Design a protein with these regions (language model features):
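Hydrophobic face of amphipathic alpha-helices that form TPR/SEL1-like repeat modules
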Residues: 52-59, 86-93, 111, 135-144, ...
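Canonical positions in the second alpha-helix
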Residues: 41, 74-75, 111, 161-162, ...
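TPR/TPR-like (Sel1-like) alpha-helical repeat modules
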Residues: 105-114, 222-242, 268-274
């Protein structure tokens, strides 16, 4: 019995030794008995709105439209207003995405709601002002088959805010048109001329053309033919292709009617304008 018991204890001891970690003769563990750690991949950290915006704009440059839109939407949903503005422009113009004025309107409205009080002297203020201008134009005409109906009074509020607070030249031009046409505002050509003037000084070609035509003809303002020709010439030289037709017509009509002295004086005014802008 003692022999059997001794054997049983020896077997159990051998089993325990086999299950225990192996040690070298110096007491250190041998490597072949140590389990290798399992590498568990970590989930990538989510992009910040700014990182997503940058990735989206870079994807646009690379031609990857799907990644671009997804990244911009992620940034926009997380409050990145430049992503909201970019998507608004894309939907308004049908660039990369299908044209959708209602989606564009919603993006622009989010910017206006959140950034109306931004400092007007910061570089990004022009994007906020542009959102107000876009909203003004949507309210002016409405969006077909949606709840956004034509509301000239609301359009004037949008243009007026961007024109006054942000001093935006496009807003000033559109506000002037409302006063000139009596749409959403009292018919007030003198007020229109004032806003055209503020916009024209900033280089807005449509305002330059309208102001030039009013001054040349003496339409509700004292006639200044040479000054009017100067503004028309500036407008003609800077007009984008989609505005060249009517601006060129105004310029050519005024040039046909102008006297030699008026043309000569307009040239003097134009030279002075260009020289002062270089300084």
């Amino acid at each position: 019995m003692r022999t059997v018991e001794t054997l049983r204890i020896a077997v159990i001891g051998a089993g325990l030794l086999a299950a225990a970690p192996a040690f070298a003769f110096d007491g250190s563990k041998t490597t072949d008995a140590v389990a290798s750690p399992v590498a568990v991949p970590l989930a990538p950290a989510p992009l910040s709105p700014t990182e997503a915006f940058r990735f989206g704009t870079q994807s646009l440059k690379n031609g990857d439209k799907v990644k671009a839109v997804h990244s911009l939407e992620y940034a926009a949903e997380n409050g990145h207003f430049l992503a909201q503005w970019k998507l608004g422009r894309m939907y308004a113009e049908g660039e990369v995405v299908a044209h959708d004025d209602l989606k564009a309107f919603e993006y622009f409205r989010r910017i206006a709601d959140s950034h109306a009080d931004d400092n007007p002297d910061t570089p990004q203020a022009r994007f906020v002002a542009n959102a107000f201008v876009a909203l003004g134009n949507y309210y002016l005409s409405g969006i077909a088959n949606t709840d956004i109906k034509a509301d000239p009074d609301r359009a004037r509020e949008m243009f007026s805010y961007a024109a006054s607070y942000f001093r935006d030249p496009d807003a000033q031009y559109y506000l002037a048109r409302l006063y000139l046409d009596g749409t959403g505002a009292p018919h007030d050509p003198r007020q229109a001329a004032r806003w055209f003037g503020l916009s024209a000084q900033k280089g807005q070609c449509q305002a330059q053309a309208m102001l030039g035509a009013m001054l040349f003809a003496g339409d509700h303002v004292p006639r200044q033919a040479a000054r009017g020709l100067m503004w028309l010439a500036l407008a003609k030289d800077s007009a984008p292709s989609d505005q060249q037709g009517w601006i060129n017509n105004l310029y050519e009509s005024a040039m046909r009617q102008a006297t030699e002295d008026e043309r000569a004086l307009a040239g003097v005014y134009l030279k002075h304008w260009l020289e002062t802008r270089k300084e």
